């Protein structure tokens, strides 16, 4: 696939890693028969359609069609090039790549350099906080906020001195490229004279890590009333804030173990909650939750508890985040903090145990939260506002998938406002039908994933020749003698274009002396669509053995299909023929062909 990396090296890496371990870092997998299943990380779904085969070292999603091996998975989920995926797995497997291909590309070298600068800066900030007189202001602030040494060390918290050039001078003395330090967001270039100065000054520093645990950015919290209160690194080649969550790298083991994540608004909340024993907390990076962040959470947990500030802005953010998380298939709960406090303030005021027990432990269902949310700023003594509130709640109830839940909340509504339960049910059903109609319209335009699912279901109803080609190819990838028989009798005369291309590659693969191995074969394909189709075929559940009769039947079905097409063409032409002589000639052709086909 890539001429710069020897094929034997790629094979050594592939044999040295287990696809279950690689994918297991992104997807919660459960054993089902010989394979493992989970929710697809490439599209939102509620029912698992993503399958991983440890025997074949392949994965395939029966919903969106994504598939391949460990290299392909990293290419798709991380946006890696093939060489980057090889390098990542080589490090994991402790396989040394030839010097000429590692690092692979200039972009990769640049990103590694930027990360190394960030890692150095993090050590500098942490050193200043813990061991210098200049860090005393930061230490005092953190002590006042109740931060322990354990918290500071675990999250590698630091402090940026108040000087304009503290970090700049240290980097220069270490011969660090200051232009690269600027690209990483640590330094700012002054327009007047082009000189660089520190972006972070007189701030407590919170390192931000990517999914691999590498520091790629920082958040800085002012000690006083300076604006902005929180300052983040700008986006850079190694940092896109909509794709990362603060604390995710440290929290992921707990998230996966508990199958639950707690979503906070800020770094300090995550750190304070960690001290309180809530070790599965993450936070957005100063922006609203994004689809990619929601997907990242869903890949690792089914349940999400949203724990935002207890004010109106926090409730608004909770409502928006809940919608995104639900779309990704999360079960959402909401932790309500009283008195308008944020999580850190609550913990300082009432203690860690009470926070864990009374706030996180008593989380509301999302519907219960919405009933509180829609009351905000409303005077329910006013008839008009009361009716508007009831209508909004009925709309939310109509979205619930379980009849028991719908009935439960409708009864609550009926009792609270002395309304007829039957009337509420009728209104809820009317709204449900309208929503369903609107969804059907929008699905026809935008829901490509469901269309792909439908396409997959249709494969069960494929014509006999197409099923024959699929099953033969699945056997050919696993059995060289079957491939040899097919090559001798059929050659490459498959009727489906993709299958025809895969057959040609497969014959070439065996001609080079390779042993039957679907994963190795797929690794040598370059076309993404062929990789997808070949993976799907390799994942088919078939009997490992195929007898001569079955093999003959499949080959005959494939051979006969062009003749069936010709038969249909003759029948179609016969219906339109007006010349008696030509009609008789075509009729005889039809009779002869049917005899040949034994009809």
UniProtKB/Swiss-Prot annotation:
Role, per record: RNA polymerase that catalyzes the synthesis of short RNA molecules used as primers for DNA polymerase during DNA replication.
Gene: dnaG
Boundaries of every Toprim domain copy: 259-342
InterPro entries linked: DNA_heli_DnaB-like_N_sf (IPR036185), DNA_helicase_N/primase_C (IPR016136), DNA_primase_core_N_sf (IPR037068), DNA_primase_DnaB-bd (IPR019475), DNA_primase_DnaG (IPR006295), DNA_primase_Znf_CHC2 (IPR036977), DnaG_bac (IPR030846), DNAG_N (IPR013264)
Entry's cofactor comment: Binds 1 zinc ion per monomer. Binds two Mg(2+) per subunit.
UniProt EC number: 2.7.7.101
Comment on protein domains: Contains an N-terminal zinc-binding domain, a central core domain that contains the primase activity, and a C-terminal DnaB-binding domain.
Any single Gene Ontology cellular-component annotation: primosome complex
PANTHER family assigned: DNA PRIMASE
Stated family: Belongs to the DnaG primase family.
Protein name, as recorded: DNA primase
Keyword entries, A-Z: DNA replication, DNA-binding, DNA-directed RNA polymerase, Magnesium, Metal-binding, Nucleotidyltransferase, Primosome, Transcription, Transferase, Zinc, Zinc-finger
Subunit structure as annotated in this protein's UniProt entry: Monomer. Interacts with DnaB.
GO biological process: one example: DNA replication, synthesis of primer
HAMAP family membership: DNA_primase_DnaG
Signal peptide: none
Cofactor: Zn(2+); Mg(2+)
């Amino acid at each position: 696939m890539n001429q710069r990396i020897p094929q034997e090296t790629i094979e050594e890496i592939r044999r040295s890693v287990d696809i279950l371990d690689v994918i297991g870092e992104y997807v919660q997998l459960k054993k089902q028969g010989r394979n493992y299943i989970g929710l697809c990380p490439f599209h939102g779904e509620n029912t698992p359609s993503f399958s991983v085969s440890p025997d074949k070292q392949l994965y395939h999603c029966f919903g969106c069609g994504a598939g391949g091996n460990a290299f392909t998975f990293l290419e798709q989920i991380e946006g890696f090039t093939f060489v980057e995926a090889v390098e990542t797995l080589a490090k994991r497997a402790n396989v040394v790549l030839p010097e000429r291909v590692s690092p692979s590309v200039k972009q990769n070298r640049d990103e590694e350099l930027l990360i190394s600068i960030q890692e150095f800066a993090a050590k500098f900030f942490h050193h200043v906080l813990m061991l210098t007189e200049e860090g005393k202001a930061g230490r005092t602030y953190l002590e006042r906020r109740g931060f322990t040494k354990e918290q500071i060390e675990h999250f590698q918290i630091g402090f940026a001195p108040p000087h304009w050039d503290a970090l700049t001078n240290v980097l220069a003395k270490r011969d660090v490229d200051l232009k690269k330090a600027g690209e990483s967001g640590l330094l700012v270039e002054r327009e007047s004279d082009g000189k660089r100065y520190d972006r972070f000054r007189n701030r407590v520093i919170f390192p931000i890590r990517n999914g691999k645990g590498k520091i790629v950015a920082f958040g800085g919290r002012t000690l006083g009333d300076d604006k902005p209160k929180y300052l983040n690194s700008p986006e850079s080649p190694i940092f896109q804030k909509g794709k990362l969550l603060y604390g995710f790298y440290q929290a992921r083991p707990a998230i996966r173990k508990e199958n639950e994540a707690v979503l906070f608004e800020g770094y300090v909340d995550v750190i304070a909650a960690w001290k309180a024993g809530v070790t599965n907390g993450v936070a957005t990076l100063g922006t609203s939750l994004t689809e990619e962040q929601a997907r990242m959470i869903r890949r690792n947990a089914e349940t999400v508890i949203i724990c935002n500030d207890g004010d109106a802005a926090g409730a608004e953010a909770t409502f928006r985040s809940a919608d995104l998380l639900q779309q990704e298939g999360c079960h959402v709960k909401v932790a309500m903090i009283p008195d308008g406090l944020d999580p850190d303030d609550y913990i300082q005021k009432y203690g860690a145990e009470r926070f864990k027990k009374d706030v996180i432990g008593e989380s509301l269902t999302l519907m219960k939260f919405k009933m509180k949310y829609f009351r905000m700023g409303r005077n329910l003594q006013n008839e008009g506002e009361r009716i508007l509130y009831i209508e909004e709640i009925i709309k939310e109830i109509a979205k619930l998938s379980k009849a028991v839940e719908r009935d439960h909340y409708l009864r609550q509504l009926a009792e609270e406002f002395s309304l007829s339960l039957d009337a509420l049910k009728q209104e809820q059903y009317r709204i449900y039908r309208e929503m369903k109609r609107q969804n059907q319209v929008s699905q026809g335009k935008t829901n490509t994933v469901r269309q792909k699912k439908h396409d997959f279901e249709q494969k069960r109803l494929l014509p006999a020749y197409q099923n024959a080609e699929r099953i033969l190819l699945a056997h050919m990838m696993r059995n060289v003698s079957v491939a040899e028989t097919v090559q001798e009798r059929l050659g490459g005369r498959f009727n489906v274009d993709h299958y025809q291309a895969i057959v040609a590659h497969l014959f070439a693969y065996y001609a080079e002396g390779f042993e039957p191995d679907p994963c190795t074969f797929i690794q040598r394909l370059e076309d993404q669509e062929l990789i997808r189709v070949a993976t799907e075929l390799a994942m088919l559940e078939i009997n490992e053995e195929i007898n001569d009769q079955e093999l003959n039947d499949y080959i005959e079905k494939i051979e006969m299909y062009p003749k069936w097409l010709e038969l249909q063409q003759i029948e179609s032409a016969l219906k339109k023929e007006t010349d008696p002589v030509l009609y008789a000639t075509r009729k005889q052709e039809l009779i002869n062909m049917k005899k040949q086909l034994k009809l």
